Amino acid sequence: MPTNFTVVPVEARADGAGDEAAERTEEPGSPESADPACPTPGDGNPRENSPFINNVEVERESYFEGKNMALFEEEMDSNPMVSSLLNKLANYTNLSQGVVEHEEDEDSRRREIKAPRMGTFIGVYLPCLQNILGVILFLRLTWIVGAAGVLESFLIVAMCCTCTMLTAISMSAIATNGVVPAGGSYYMISRSLGPEFGGAVGLCFYLGTTFAGAMYILGTIEIFLTYISPSAAIFQAETADGEAAALLNNMRVYGSCALALMAVVVFVGVKYVNKLALVFLACVVLSILAIYAGVIKTAFAPPDIPVCLLGNRTLANRNFDTCAKMQVVSNGTVTTALWRLFCNGSSLGASCDEYFVQNNVTEIQGIPGVASGVFLDNLWSTYSDKGAFVEKKGVSSVPVSEESRPGGLPYVLTDIMTYFTMLVGIYFPSVTGIMAGSNRSGDLKDAQKSIPTGTILAIVTTSFIYLSCIVLFGACIEGVVLRDKFGEALQGNLVIGMLAWPSPWVIVIGSFFSTCGAGLQSLTGAPRLLQAIARDGIIPFLQVFGHGKANGEPTWALLLTALICETGILIASLDSVAPILSMFFLMCYMFVNLACAVQTLLRTPNWRPRFKFYHWTLSFLGMSLCLALMFICSWYYALFAMLIAGCIYKYIEYRGAEKEWGDGIRGLSLNAARYALLRVEHGPPHTKNWRPQVLVMLNLDSEQCVKHPRLLSFTSQLKAGKGLTIVGSVLEGTYLDKHVEAQRAEENIRSLMSAEKMKGFCQLVVSSNLRDGASHLIQSAGLGGMKHNTVLMAWPEAWKQADNPFSWKNFVDTVRDTTAAHQALLVAKNIDLFPQNQERFSDGNIDVWWIVHDGGMLMLLPFLLRQHKVWRKCRMRIFTVAQVDDNSIQMKKDLQMFLYHLRISAEVEVVEMVENDISAFTYEKTLMMEQRSQMLKQMQLSKNEREREAQLIHDRNTASHTVATARTEAPPTPDKVQMTWTKEKLIAEKHRNKDTGTSGFKDLFSLKPDQSNVRRMHTAVKLNGVVLNKSQDAQLVLLNMPGPPKSRQGDENYMEFLEVLTEGLNRVLLVRGGGREVITIYS
């Protein structure tokens, strides 16, 4: 159950309270609690393991020797300079499928992978083409057209192609939402939907691929035994009724032998399978070209392919050569071989079949050609029962009373019952294979570009081929020939082969090798898919299949794949196996669409697909179409497949899938109450799911009204109604005395939140002092997994003129608290200049100054802001700083590549900072800062005098900066500092504070600035000048916020550094990461 711990002070502290709820306060004279030698938690940077970016356990004393970036030098051990990091960020390497996930292996050495090299055409388009075009096109498409007619066949193909196109659009969005490591479709589904759905759908996809192998092998054997070498059959039918059983037994024997041979080939030399892939693809392309060439030829020279009809019944052209009952030979009439098949003798008086006697024998052309007008006859469907005669529509026939169908007669009969939904199930496997390109994602040069382009082009190409073939088959081939599945009326030839030109053998041999190659590809891909699932460890009993040979080949997975494939071969019927794999592929495609729809509707910050032509409605339509096709194909198969997936899902959930992949289903947990809170309780969210859950620290005035209402406006623009927002504030006092004021303050805050249309929670704390109250909020706001990870506060504008000289300590300690809590910190400077929600920026830039890498928040925040209509038209520009030794040209290329992988559109500029000498102005500014600090520490002035001295030094500071920017050379450092107090007053102060020593104030006039402070001031001045030069007119500037000093003695100097760093800018957002990665290039 959710637990909260709050650190509270053990001893009473003499800390007072300032006027700001977000500022730390301390009474004058209170002892410094921090030992410089022993920094407390919150100093510097957090130390936490992955996914936190800081993993360095050894302090590096002199990491950075230069002067330009001295302001950030205490953080260099955890937040490296961008210039040193860009090359690693841009030039990523894909991880091979099955290795430990990149998000779980961030601290270990990456496995070296060969650089990808394939482009869109070779890597995606051709593999998809090869996998989509296959056995159904050559063996069943003509039969589907004959049974369903051109119109319904067109509808079947259009539905299936629409389903795959919608799925490809969803898959393209997922594939372009980050780097897709090798692992392809399984990786995309599992990382988008979580381990439960990922495991269930992954296994369904594996089973579909395995049964596809069985279907291809059965297709190979059917081509071999039916069209290449019928005499090779082992089992021979003694009667006509036994032919079907004999064929099935032959398929089982030859199929098992072919499977064993292919499994050995895959086990011994998978590289040869890959090398032969182009050969198999060439066979497919040549076969299709031969079909189109044959269609063109029929327009002017149709082939002479006679088909014999008895009445309106089609006759199988076997055991007779003349389509006639009698023929004239030597001026005499004799019976033909056809007569002897229907009669019990060759004489004219022999007893014959009644239908044979009553009806005439006619001969028609099987392929009359495009211009024959047969298209209209084939327009409508002709469904039939099993064992029905294949009859020609429109031909007269004399019915007979004998309805029995005696065996041995050479009729062409239907082998199975045909109807629309059954044909959908048989046809759908012919459009699968759209994920062949994504499965090769690890071998592509640019997967984000190649996968959408290649896959969609392949679907368009194959859809055109299928749809055109349906129309052309209906226009060229006689209906009875189309419905003749095995070409019995054509002397056992392949129907589509008889249409092809120049020879039927082009189709026969081409289809044989293409189906053989497709079977090898399935037996190659399925074991690797199972190996990836096993190595993920989400299904414990499958983990043994994650092991293999020394080179990583999945030996055990191949063995299981062969056994499952054998069950499909024992079914022995291609028409029975096709609906099974249709179920598994449809379920896989359905969840791809679901993944895209969920991610789009959740609008997680990591959902930034580079492919823009998607919409959740398209994904939902694709998901609905997949589900509908599952039940159209076979409702009982659909229920069985869903039952298998459901059992796997519950098993993974029961065993506890302790995998965190940053999936969309986890994001839904935040919208459910108790159950969801318990689910998101375990550990921090994955980098892909990270979004700013903001705690807004508000300041209240004496009337309990919000001082900076635009801070809430900015929060609503940043959040856009998504995620968690907690608005917090602190009242000083005891709850018994302040509960009325607390209620009034909470009502004021809620009304302001309502006015800003901001959805969130209000949490107000009454504490004895503001310092502890703010610390309580940072520690304990939220519940369980609904806790903030980011603190947003306004910059204390009046930190120099506050009533309490130590009011700035409240701010610095807040920075330390957020760092210790591993929370990000956003500080809005000049918050009253920020836009309200009603304002619109019609132009302008959001400038990001990326100095050090502290998790990537600087990249994520502008992206989130630009989702809001206030900032939508602003352009994003990213600046980074190059030192003398850096290659700025290469840095720019690397940064552009990194942003490309992040799917963020932004202009990139690398600014070179020359390491020049420290200017006199910087030296003077540092001296003034230290003099002010020493004065406030060593002299206990009255309130008015202290304000007067602080203001004087601030005015001289500002004036000297104005002179320095107006002239090329800054004025020299003054010899002394003018004071407004008298000598007598000074002596009285000294006698009153003898414990402070008499030498401290004398040293004030001869003070030399500390070299470390000079270098830090130099950094602040130089960066400020560079930022002003580039971004003075920007609508918003985002800057890395340097961490507070590890020694608390320099806190007041830290405030001065930040003031100088941001001087002259209108709207500034200082960003300090929480010590963990918040943005990733991965999907």
Curated annotation (Swiss-Prot):
Membrane side Extracellular: residue ranges: 143-149, 226-249, 301-419, 474-504
Expression across tissues: Widely expressed with highest levels in kidney, liver and pancreas. Expressed in choroid plexus and suprachiasmatic nucleus.
GO biological process, one term: potassium ion import across plasma membrane
Residues in the Cytoplasmic compartment per record: 1-119, 173-196, 441-450, 532-554, 599-612, 652-1083
PTM annotation (Phosphoserine): residues: 30, 33, 50, 62
Region (Disordered): 1-51
UniProt feature, compositional bias: Basic and acidic residues: 12-27
Domain of life: Eukaryota
Keyword list, A-Z: Cell membrane, Chloride, Glycoprotein, Ion transport, Membrane, Metal-binding, Phosphoprotein, Potassium, Potassium transport, Symport, Transmembrane, Transmembrane helix, Transport
Glycosites: 312, 331, 360
Single GO cellular component term: protein-containing complex
Catalytic activity: K(+)(in) + chloride(in) = K(+)(out) + chloride(out)
Positions that bind K(+): 131-132, 429, 432
A Pfam family this chain is assigned to: SLC12
Residues given in the record as chloride 1 binding sites: 433-434, 589
Region of interest: Scissor helix: 664-680
UniProt: chloride 2 binding residues: 135, 429
Description of how activity is regulated: Activated by N-ethylmaleimide (NEM). Inhibited by furosemide, DIDS and bumetanide. The inhibition is much stronger in the presence of 50 mM K(+) in the uptake medium. Inhibited by DIOA. Inhibited by WNK3.
Membership in a protein family: Belongs to the SLC12A transporter family. K/Cl co-transporter subfamily.
Record text on subunit structure and interactions: Homodimer; adopts a domain-swap conformation at the scissor helices connecting the transmembrane domain and C-terminal domain. Heterodimer with K-Cl cotransporter SLC12A5.
Role noted for this protein: Mediates electroneutral potassium-chloride cotransport when activated by cell swelling. May mediate K(+) uptake into Deiters' cells in the cochlea and contribute to K(+) recycling in the inner ear. Important for the survival of cochlear outer and inner hair cells and the maintenance of the organ of Corti. May be required for basolateral Cl(-) extrusion in the kidney and contribute to renal acidification.
Name assigned to this protein: Solute carrier family 12 member 7
Gene: Slc12a7
